[in-house]
């Protein structure tokens, strides 16, 4: 199977090659702001067609496993969806969570309130309640859990992980949910707090496969939302000495994930991984791309090739909501090629102003925009990029490496263009290749061609760029 996606002024190609060549080759195209549709494919040839850049699937080898594409499910998104008629809500969820739409299979939950909640809360705001006698997830039952259960009905294969924005205020320096640090004398009670959350969700039929110690541990969001600051040493100590043992003692398979912040934090991650017990205690390193570049994590992946890495948050900015899908495809491909096995967006649904959020001032847009006036659900450009992966790449696929061969010709060099590529091998043996091409600003439109080699045959894929 072969799928190709085209868009105005840029080109994003997603290729699936099955095991019997032409009979299983299909081409799909998405034009700018349009729908994906199947188009006629070219023929495979036994001879190379010129000295082109080549995606050589015959030479590719396994890199690391693909764990899925996802989106976060904050209270704000669930509140907006709760106001819709049931069937309308189900239509939107099917668009996001099935392969007829974006094909997402991973959901990120917030432990307590986040910047995209209706108000600030935790699950135990009773000051000094070290026994957690007042612990309750009733706030999540208002909007979040009903939507989570509808997502499970739409796609029972969805997996969940969770991140906290802040411990209860009474556990922290300064007694404020916004900013500050967790008091060391409360590491134990906070680990038990996180365990109680995971158990409470389990009782609701929601299995939390992983938990990060803290969302963005080096950001206090200028006091605008729940946050908590952690040094690398504090985070590592909490995971190794408190959180991982508490999860094990409770009989939970949930794994702690390290960091959950930007690519520019590689030095901190290096130091944390060198701390005694960290590698044995964590299930992955989690990343955000708001600062730094995906390539910065490659040395960590090379040093620890069996340590999973995942992208846990990145969504559209409200001022750049219509940023083209190639920008997102480029980021995703570079992230996969740098060692991450999964990519999760930020808010599932927001309105056209990026609302609601806890302060009213945060600038994020939704994976899907729900217009507050018309009620229309508009997929973002990020959604359209996700769709080219989510429809075709299956959980457990190998993310391949060693497949790109630069051709020796002016045509291949394409000095005015930039090409990025990612390749996958699904559990059923089908091959998926995503190729992104874009011209330098001001360059004339002309064909962009890349040669795909599979089972000693060749296929030229072409699009206008």
Task: Label every PLM stretch briefly.
Residues 3-12:
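Sec-dependent signal peptide recognition
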Residues 20-23:
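Boundary at the C-terminal end of the N-terminal hydrophobic targeting segment
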Residues 33-208, 241:
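N-terminal catalytic cores of secreted or lumenal carbohydrate-active enzymes
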Residues 67-75, 105-111, 115, 159-163, ...:
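Structural recognition of the beta-strand scaffold that forms the well-ordered cores
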Residues 116-120, 168-175, 217-223, 266-268, ...:
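Short acidic/His/Gly/Ser-rich catalytic and metal-binding motifs that mark active-site loops
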Residues 188-210, 217-319:
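Active-site neighborhood of glycoside hydrolase catalytic domains
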Residues 308-393, 398-408:
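Aromatic/acidic polysaccharide-binding cleft in carbohydrate-active enzymes
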Residues 406-462:
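Carbohydrate-binding surface patches
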């Amino acid at each position: 199977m072969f799928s190709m996606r085209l868009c105005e002024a840029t080109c994003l190609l997603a290729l699936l090659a099955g095991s019997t060549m032409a009979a299983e080759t299909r081409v799909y195209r998405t034009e700018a702001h349009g729908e994906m549709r199947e188009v006629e494919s070219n023929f495979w040839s036994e001879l190379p067609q010129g000295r082109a850049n080549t995606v050589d699937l015959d030479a590719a080898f396994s890199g690391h496993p693909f764990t899925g594409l996802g989106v976060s499910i904050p209270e704000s998104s669930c509140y907006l969806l709760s106001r819709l008629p049931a069937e309308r809500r189900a239509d939107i969820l099917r668009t996001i969570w099935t392969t007829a739409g974006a094909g997402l299979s991973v959901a990120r939950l917030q432990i307590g309130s986040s910047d995209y909640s209706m108000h600030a809360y935790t699950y135990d705001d009773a000051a000094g309640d070290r026994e957690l006698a007042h612990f309750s997830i009733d706030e999540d039952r208002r909007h979040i859990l009903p939507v989570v259960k509808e997502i499970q009905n739409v796609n029972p294969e969805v997996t969940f992980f969770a991140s906290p924005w802040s411990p209860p205020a009474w556990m922290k320096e300064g007694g404020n949910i916004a900013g500050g640090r967790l008091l060391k004398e409360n590491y134990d009670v906070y680990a038990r707090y996180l365990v109680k959350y995971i158990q409470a969700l389990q009782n609701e039929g929601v299995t939390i496969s992983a938990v990060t110690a803290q969302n963005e541990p080096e950001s206090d969001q200028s006091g605008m939302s729940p946050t908590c600051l952690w040094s690398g040493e504090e985070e590592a100590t909490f995971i190794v000495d408190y959180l991982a043992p508490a999860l094990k003692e409770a009989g939970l398979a949930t794994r702690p994930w390290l960091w959950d912040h930007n690519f520019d934090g590689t030095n901190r991650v290096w130091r944390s991984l060198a701390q005694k017990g960290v590698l044995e205690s964590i299930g992955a390193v989690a990343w955000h791309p708001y600062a730094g570049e995906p390539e910065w994590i490659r040395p960590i992946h090379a040093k620890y090739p069996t340590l999973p890495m995942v992208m846990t948050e990145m969504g559209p900015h409200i001022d750049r909501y219509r940023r083209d899908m190639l920008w997102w495809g480029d980021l995703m491909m570079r992230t996969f090629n740098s060692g991450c096995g999964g990519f999760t967006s930020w808010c599932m649904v927001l309105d056209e102003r990026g609302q609601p959020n806890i302060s009213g001032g945060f600038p994020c847009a939704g994976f899907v925009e729900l217009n507050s006036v018309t009620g229309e659900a508009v997929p973002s450009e990020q959604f359209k990029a996700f769709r080219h992966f989510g429809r075709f790449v299956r959980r457990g696929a190998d993310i391949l490496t060693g497949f790109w061969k630069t051709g020796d010709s002016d045509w291949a060099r394409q000095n005015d263009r930039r090409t990025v590529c990612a390749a996958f091998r699904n559990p059923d043996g089908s091959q998926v290749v995503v190729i992104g091409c874009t011209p330098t600003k001001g360059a004339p439109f002309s064909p962009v061609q890349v040669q795909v080699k599979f089972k000693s045959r060749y296929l030229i894929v072409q699009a206008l760029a």
